[in-house]
């Protein structure tokens, strides 16, 4: 491992030990904000420091074993120790490289998840509903909270568009690669001839930004419309213009929120989604200028814009970005999508490592 990387790891270990001492300090314990900040930093360093300690121990094992090579009785055991330690060192170094990759500061944030029906008419709306259930069940398995912000239901079931907020630990980092076109191939319930149809939905995932990171939005750039909610809620929603639609005129971005009975609450939620969309759109524009590696946040919803295909007759799901196919469609649609998400994250980390190697 390079000296510069070892020096970096040693400085992280020093900071970790410093934080350990600080967290036992009475003055820090009595200051909740400071204690919370130090605890978070401590937990973020824990894995990399433990990994580095293991690397140090393995190198020490090799040094001690090499001394025993001159002893005829211990030579065979020492050689075995050296071989095993060297093999593990390779694995640990790979792990350390990944742990030292630049972190996306947004990964720890909650996120907004948008699903929109694209081509395919009613069937696309039904599939949007299926995707919503898939993500909801996945969130449930992770003990995340899903909060409905806006839902435009389609006539045959499902949604023309649905927007939810997903809250929990590391939500955006886990879901961000779900953005893109999702295609379904199956025989619709409304199809009498038994023909397979292809429909599409687009998914967009955006981090919920803290107030300190939200862009300044000029009120003069906004058009705010209120209307009666079409969702559940009985008589109340039919008599109150509580739903809010905000249009950001310079970018043309439109956000609707109708989940709350209070117009004020709906407006606050819509403004938060709008801020995230504006920031994300700008980041996407900058990324497009620099590299083609990052995918567009939200495609057209056309069949050609696809990251994943769900084929019901064959019971398979294919992720086209990494040519991954699994034949457990029922499990996937019931929320077991870690085996689709983790390989994408691993591939992204490999791309980052390759880019760093080229720079060095």
UniProtKB/Swiss-Prot annotation:
UniProt PTM comment: Methylated by PrmC. Methylation increases the termination efficiency of RF1.
Domain of life: Bacteria
The UniProt record lists the keyword Protein biosynthesis: yes
InterPro entries: PCRF, Pep_chain_release_fac_I, Pep_chain_release_fac_I_sf, Prokaryotic/Mito_RF, RF-1
Keyword set, alphabetical order: Cytoplasm, Methylation, Protein biosynthesis
Basic and acidic residues compositional bias, start-end: 285-295
Modification N5-methylglutamine occurs at: 235
Signal peptide (from-to): none
Places the protein is found: Cytoplasm
Gene Ontology annotations for the cellular component aspect, listed alphabetically: cytoplasm
GO molecular function: translation release factor activity, codon specific
Family statement: Belongs to the prokaryotic/mitochondrial release factor family.
PANTHER family tied to this protein: LD18447P
Summary of the function given for this chain in its UniProt record: Peptide chain release factor 1 directs the termination of translation in response to the peptide chain termination codons UAG and UAA.
Protein name: Peptide chain release factor 1
Record organism: Haemophilus influenzae (strain 86-028NP)
Top-level taxonomy: Bacteria, Pseudomonadati, Pseudomonadota, Gammaproteobacteria, Pasteurellales
